[in-house]
UniProtKB/Swiss-Prot annotation:
One of its GO terms (biological process) is cell division. ATP binds at P121, T122, G123, C124, G125, K126, T127, Y128. This is ATP-dependent Clp protease ATP-binding subunit ClpX. Component of the ClpX-ClpP complex. Forms a hexameric ring that, in the presence of ATP, binds to fourteen ClpP subunits assembled into a disk-like structure with a central cavity, resembling the structure of eukaryotic proteasomes. ATP-dependent specificity component of the Clp protease. It directs the protease to specific substrates. Can perform chaperone functions in the absence of ClpP. Belongs to the ClpX chaperone family. Residues 5-58 form the ClpX-type ZB domain. It comes from Bartonella bacilliformis (strain ATCC 35685 / KC583 / Herrer 020/F12,63). Zn(2+) binds at C17, C20, C39, C42. Pfam families: AAA_2, ClpB_D2-small, zf-C4_ClpX. Keywords: ATP-binding, Chaperone, Metal-binding, Nucleotide-binding, Zinc. InterPro entries: AAA+_ATPase (IPR003593), ATP-dep_Clp_protease_ClpX (IPR050052), ATPase_AAA_core (IPR003959), Clp_ATPase_C (IPR019489), Clp_protease_ATP-bd_su_ClpX (IPR004487), ClpX_bact (IPR046425), P-loop_NTPase (IPR027417), Znf_CppX_C4 (IPR010603). It comes from the Bacteria. One of its GO terms (molecular function) is ATP hydrolysis activity.
Length: 424
C-alpha cells in the first residue's frame, strides 16, 4: 500500500510493508502482491516459523530424538509381539539419531554408525518394523530388494540405485537423504553360493556383498539422477552415506540347522552319539545366533562386520496372528470392515473364525503375510454379490465359512423383509 506523508520527512507515495508497517526505505526489498506488500524481513520471519514447525513434527524429545520408550509405544500400535526385536531396534535408532544430533557439538570423540540386521522367519514383521520406524522418526525411507542387485557392469541394478531411491523419497533434497533409512530385504539371498570362494565370478551373491560394503560403512556415492545405465552422460549427485542407517533383513532359511549343529562333533560306528533333534521353534533357535553362523550360511565376514546389531524375530503363533488380524490400528479386519462400510454393510467375524484364519496361515507357513490372501479368498464371493444386493445390513463370518463348510450369513433390514412378505 502507499501512503501520502504530511510531515515532509517521507516522500509522497512511499510504499509500506502490509505486515510490519516499515517503509520501503527501511528494508532491503519490498515484494508486491495484488493489493499488499511484504518486506524481506517478514519473509525470513515466516520461513523461520515454518522451519520450527517442521522440526517439531513427530514425537521429539528436547534433543530432537524420540526416546526408546516412545519409539516402542508407537511400534506397539502397529506391530504385534516381537518385544525383543522392538527393544533392540528402538535403542539402535535412538542412539543413531542422537549421534547425529550431537555430531557437530563435540568432535573429540567420533561415534561409529551401527547398522542393523533383522533375522526372522517369513511373515514375522521385519519389513513392517523398518517402515514404521522411518515413519516415527520422520526421515526419508526406501526399501530395496537384494535379489535384484548385481555388481556394476552386469545386468541388474547397481547398489547406487538404492541411494537414488532414497534421494527420490527425499524429493532430491540431498541433506535430508543423508539422514534417511535404507531397508535391504532378502539379504539372505545374496549369500555366497559355496563355503569356499568360487573360481567363477559370483555377481549376484558375494559380488553384491562386496559392492554394499562401502555404501554401508560410509562413502561419497556418485548417484545419477536418472539411473546410471540408460543415461551415461548425465551429471552425478554426490551423496555422503556416512549417516544413512542401513537395516538388512532376511528369513535365512536353513540357518536354524547351522545354529543347532554348532559345536557338534560327528562320529561314526557303534560308539557314535545320537543327538535328539532340536524341537524348538525357528524363532527360539535364532536367539542363539552368533556371527560365525552367518559366515557358515554364506555372508562374508566384512559384510557381517558392517551389521554390528543383530535383532532376531520370533515366528508367530496362533494367538499372535489373531491379535494381528484384529488389534493394530490398520488391522486386516478393520480394513475389510471399512471396505464393507462403503456399501453400508456391517462385517463381523466370530472369534473362532479368526483362529481358523490364523491356523490356515500357520499351515501354509506364510506368517502374517499370508493373512490377506486367506481373507480375500473367504470374502471374494461376498464382495462380488454385495453391490447388487439390496437391504443387506450385516455379514457374519464363522469358522465354518473359513473352512468352506458354509456360506457367510447375510442379515437383511426389516424393510426389505416386509417388502418380500407383501409381494408373497
Amino acid at each position: 500500500m502507499s501512503k501520502v506523508s504530511n510531515s515532509g520527512s517521507e516522500p509522497k507515495n512511499t510504499l509500506y510493508c502490509s505486515f510490519c508497517g516499515k517503509s520501503q526505505h527501511e528494508v532491503r526489498k519490498l515484494i508486491a502482491g495484488p493489493t499488499v506488500f511484504i518486506c524481506d524481513e517478514c519473509v525470513e520471519l515466516c520461513m523461520d516459523i515454518i522451519r520450527e514447525e517442521n522440526k517439531s513434527s513427530g514425537i521429539k524429545t528436547r534433543d530432537g530424538v524420540p526416546t526408546p520408550q516412545e519409539i516402542i509405544e508407537v511400534l506397539d500400535d502397529y506391530v504385534i509381539g516381537q518385544r525383543y526385536a522392538k527393544r533392540v531396534l528402538s535403542v539402535a535408532v535412538h542412539n543413531h539419531y542422537k549421534r547425529l544430533a550431537h555430531q557437530s557439538k563435540n568432535n573429540a570423540i567420533e561415534l561409529a554408525k551401527s547398522n542393523i540386521l533383522l533375522v526372522g522367519p517369513t511373515g514375522c514383521g521385519k519389513t513392517y518394523l523398518a517402515q514404521t520406524l522411518a515413519r516415527i522418526i520422520d526421515v526419508p525411507f526406501t526399501m530395496a530388494d537384494a535379489t535384484t542387485l548385481t555388481e556394476a557392469g552386469y545386468v541388474g541394478e547397481d547398489v547406487e540405485n538404492i541411494i537414488l531411491k532414497l534421494l527420490q523419497s527425499a524429493d532430491y533434497n540431498v541433506e535430508r537423504a543423508q539422514r534417511g533409512i535404507v531397508y535391504i530385504d532378502e539379504v539372505d539371498k545374496i549369500s555366497r553360493k559355496a563355503d569356499n570362494p568360487s573360481i567363477t565370478r559370483d555377481v549376484s551373491g558375494e559380488g553384491v556383498q562386496q559392492a554394499l560394503l562401502k555404501i554401508m560403512e560410509g562413502t561419497i556415492a556418485s548417484v545419477p539422477p536418472q539411473g546410471g545405465r540408460k543415461h551415461p552422460q548425465q551429471e552425478f549427485l554426490q551423496v555422503d552415506t556416512t549417516n544413512i542407517l542401513f537395516i538388512c533383513g532376511g528369513a535365512f532359511a536353513g540357518l536354524e540347522r547351522i545354529i543347532s549343529g554348532r559345536g557338534e562333533k560327528t562320529s561314526i560306528g557303534f560308539s557314535a552319539t545320537i543327538k535328539a533333534p532340536d524341537e524348538r521353534r525357528v524363532g527360539e533357535i535364532f536367539h542363539d545366533l552368533e556371527p560365525e553362523d552367518l559366515v557358515k550360511f554364506g555372508l562374508i565376514p566384512e559384510f557381517i562386520g558392517r551389521l554390528p546389531i543383530i535383532a532376531t524375530l520370533e515366528d508367530l503363533d496362533i494367538d499372535a496372528l489373531v491379535r494381528i488380524l484384529s488389534q493394530p490400528k490398520n488391522a486386516l479386519v478393520k480394513q475389510y470392515q471399512h471396505l464393507f462400510e462403503m456399501e453400508n454393510v456391517e462385517l463381523t467375524f466370530h472369534e473362532d473364525a479368526l483362529r481358523a484364519i490364523a491356523n490356515k496361515a500357520i499351515e501354509r507357513k506364510t506368517g502374517a503375510r499370508g493373512l490377506r490372501s486367506i481373507m480375500e479368498k473367504i470374502l471374494l464371493d461376498t464382495m462380488f454379490e454385495l453391490p447388487a444386493l439390496e437391504g443387506v445390513q450385516k455379514v457374519v463370518i464363522s469358522s465354518d465359512v473359513v473352512e468352506g463348510k458354509a456360506r457367510p450369513l447375510y442379515i437383511y433390514s426389516e424393510r426389505v423383509e416386509d417388502k418380500e412378505n407383501v409381494s408373497a
